[in-house]
């Protein structure tokens, strides 16, 4: 995880930045699934936590070899005109680290009740007692909107940037490039 590549969204009057970032992130996810492995992480250096926005830059963190392999894939077809690429570069030192991870909200009590009813053979009334409407939790985190390849449903993938740390701990990344224990340099 000693190299990185910045991909910046170009201003576009037809597409808002959040929409372009969602498309870019979805294409990256597909490329990471095809490439396999758990050694590529992402961060959003232009993050604006006060407004829950990821910003207009996606940073991909990897070794030089993993970054070269990713860039050799044709995963950005149809999107290149909307993007500006930096050159792969070495991570500056010293730099702090942080986890960039997915957060799943338990925001839909109705869905949770249906799941509980299916799994435990409960009536709707019993499920409502166990999961009242008050359990709904809205997240105030930035997100990308993706489309599930298996169901076709659109969903929000909420992203949390954890606190800064002096050192990185060992861990990997998901096929979204998000932490499953791994840390990325933050600069």
Swiss-Prot record:
Annotated consequence of substituting residue 49 to K: Restores biofilm formation upon phage infection, crRNA forms
Active site per the UniProt annotation: 29 (proton acceptor)
Superkingdom, natural source: Bacteria
Biological process terms in GO annotation: defense response to virus; maintenance of CRISPR repeat elements
Residues of the site described as Substrate binding: 148
Reported impact of residue 176 to A: Cleaves pre-crRNA 130-fold slower
One Pfam family per UniProt: Cas_Csy4
Result after altering residue 150 to A: Cleaves pre-crRNA 350-fold slower
Top enzyme class: hydrolase
Annotated effect of mutating residue 49 to A: No biofilm formation upon phage infection, no crRNA formed
Knockout-associated phenotype: Infection with phage DMS3 inhibits biofilm formation; disrupting this gene restores biofilm formation despite DMS3 infection. Normal biofilm formation in the absence of phage infection. Loss of production of crRNA in the presence or absence of phage. Disruption of the entire Y.pestis-subtype CRISPR region disrupts crRNA production but does not alter phage resistance (possibly OLNs PA14_33350 to PA14_33310, plus the flanking CRISPR loci), indicating this CRISPR is not involved in phage resistance.
Cofactor annotation comment: Metal-ion independent.
Molecular function GO labels: endonuclease activity; RNA binding
Keyword Hydrolase belongs to the record: yes
Enzyme nomenclature, EC number: 3.1.-.-
Keyword annotations: Antiviral defense, Endonuclease, Hydrolase, Nuclease, RNA-binding
Quaternary data: Part of the Csy ribonucleoprotein complex with a probable stoichiometry of Csy1(1),Csy2(1),Csy3(6),Cas6/Csy4(1)-crRNA(1). A Csy3(6),Cas6/Csy4(1)-crRNA(1) subcomplex is also formed.
Function comment: CRISPR (clustered regularly interspaced short palindromic repeat) is an adaptive immune system that provides protection against mobile genetic elements (viruses, transposable elements and conjugative plasmids). CRISPR clusters contain sequences complementary to antecedent mobile elements and target invading nucleic acids. CRISPR clusters are transcribed and processed into CRISPR RNA (crRNA). Processes pre-crRNA into individual crRNA units. Absolutely required for crRNA production or stability.
Note: In this bacteria, Y.pestis-subtype CRISPRs do not confer resistance to phage DMS3 or MP22, but instead are required for DMS3-dependent inhibition of biofilm formation and possibly motility.
NCBIfam families: cas_Csy4 (TIGR02563)
Record-stated family: Belongs to the CRISPR-associated endoribonuclease Cas6 family. Cas6f/Csy4, subtype I-F/Ypest subfamily.
Protein name, UniProt field: CRISPR-associated endonuclease Cas6/Csy4
Phylogenetic lineage: Bacteria, Pseudomonadati, Pseudomonadota, Gammaproteobacteria, Pseudomonadales
